[in-house]
Amino acid sequence: MNAPTQDLPYFQNPKHERNFLLLLAAMQFTHVVDFMILMPMGPLLMKTMSLTPAAFGSMVSAYTFSAGIAGILSAIFLDRFERKKAMLVVYMGFILGTLLCALAPNAHLLLLARIVCGGFGGVMVALVFALIGDAIPMARRGAAMGLVMTAFSVASIAGVPLGLYLSNHFGWKMPFVALTVGSLLMWFVALRLLPRMRRPALITGALADFGAILGKPIHWRAFAFTFAMMGSTFMVIPYISSYFVANSNVANDELPWLFFAGGLFTFFTLRWFGALGDRHGLFRVFAWISLAAVGPVLLLTHFGAWGLYAAIAMTVVFMVLVSGRSAPGMALLTTVVEPRLRGGFMSLNTAMQQIASGAGSFAAGLIIVEGAGGRFERYGLVGWLAAAGILASIWLGAGLGETKK
């Protein structure tokens, strides 16, 4: 991997640096909402398009598979282009993919549109992190990453509930229309405010030293750790909304409250879990949270007709613990690779996250069936498999060699 020759601040004015990061966070927000919105719209889409759970799972997994593959392929050529030009082209492709979702007349074309969105979205995420690496000195890079990553929590708190409101009142296409308009506005803001990288771009996402990365058994264990962690999560998440509506007396227009409450709590707990990992050891905290998450996973996937308030409480506990594993878990991964290989390793690991998410949702879709009256059956079996994946991630994480950060 080419090492940077200097680590000087790109922005001389701290205000300009913060505006740059807020712009990236806003662009990331549109991508996260686009990725997340399909899952809580499951009940509406399955009814409107007569989708089986397997067909819906394919639609969710198509996005993540496409993002994973595109993320790997883009690492080969992305660093040959000036960052701003590359981001504007890729973001426009993402916008067009979102527009295709809004225009899709049937499930087959919606599936193709999701593949387009996922492909451009996966490259866009790589570019966001590359821009941060190019423009922000190492001393402030962690805080910069944290600011941009808040897009995930904000998407859960505001973006997904608003999208569900639009879909419940104006049809499933309206969230994609709103996203297209909002993203197009962000494109023009980026055209004006996103700076050109005047110095050579750092190779933050290229598959440099590819053979060295794949030649180390510890790296393969780390990839398996990521697959178990993300695959177990996405066996459950895409079907929560559909399960609550079909089996638990939760109405479609009540679903936004689940995501608002879950996102609000995770906005605070994610940082807290990360701090616990720094204080008590990354693997130790990851193992604690993972063991604590097994119970909520099993309870949620065997949830009875207990109504809205019980569903909100269960969703909050589930989201806090399942997402809470990611803070110490992802930090743990950075300890297994030497610095000169870290860029390529993390690029491959990000692609593995996407592929594992797609594999988890696709596998669960093959297991779940609709019973009498549209009720979900065998979601409990999915819960047991997800619990096994969580336990497997603990075993795999124990072999990564970190005991105290």
Q: Where is each model-derived feature located?
A:
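Cytoplasmic helix-loop-helix junction between adjacent transmembrane helices
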Residues: 113-151
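C-terminal transmembrane helical hairpin of 12-TM major facilitator-type secondary transporters
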Residues: 283-329
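Extracytoplasmic gate region of multi-pass secondary transporters
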Residues: 38-39, 219-260
